[in-house]
Amino acid sequence: ETASNAFLHTWSLGVEEQFYLVWPLLILLIAPWAQGQPRRLAWFWLLVASLSLLACLWLVQSQAMLAFYLMPTRAWQFAAGALAWLLAQHLRPSLAQAKSASWLGLGLLVLSLIAIDASTLYPSMWALLPTMASMALLWAGSTDTLPAAIKPLCSAPMQAIGRLSYAWYLWHWPILVIGQQILPIHGHLGNTVLALGLSLLAAIAT
């Protein structure tokens, strides 16, 4: 059922809008206590991340779909982004640390591609892999001298793809689902590339 729903992926828009509503309220709530105190702020986001992750790991065992789609069980990933920002602002890495973090991030991304597939219970502990990878790469990129391992990620073409990535994400799924009704896509590399190319053009146009 989900594989034939052309608008399934728009759940992320709902989570995003909830994030825009809830996150500012959290910041206002803790501002008097944490203003000018990055360590306190870090502890707060770590607490949010821990509670949300525990809820996610508990719920995914019995209601994997709810754990996947609900904002409270994905809030730990938003909190991880907040922690990455705090690290980049207040604990910038040395070049040696940035090199280590960049290779760690890339390694975790590769491991994610290998370990996570359609049969993987998700989001579970496996969701830590791409999340920690993103944190490591963001922290590594906050140094003045970029490590060689992540310089390609900061190139103009990659930045252009980054700017288009969310629009591309919004277009790719309906084109794949609708395209499957016209041409066989699953298991056909050429048609898959064609569908992804069309979704990229749609992202550029919009």
Each predicted region: which residue ranges?
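Membrane-interface helix/loop caps of multi-pass membrane proteins
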Residues: 1-206
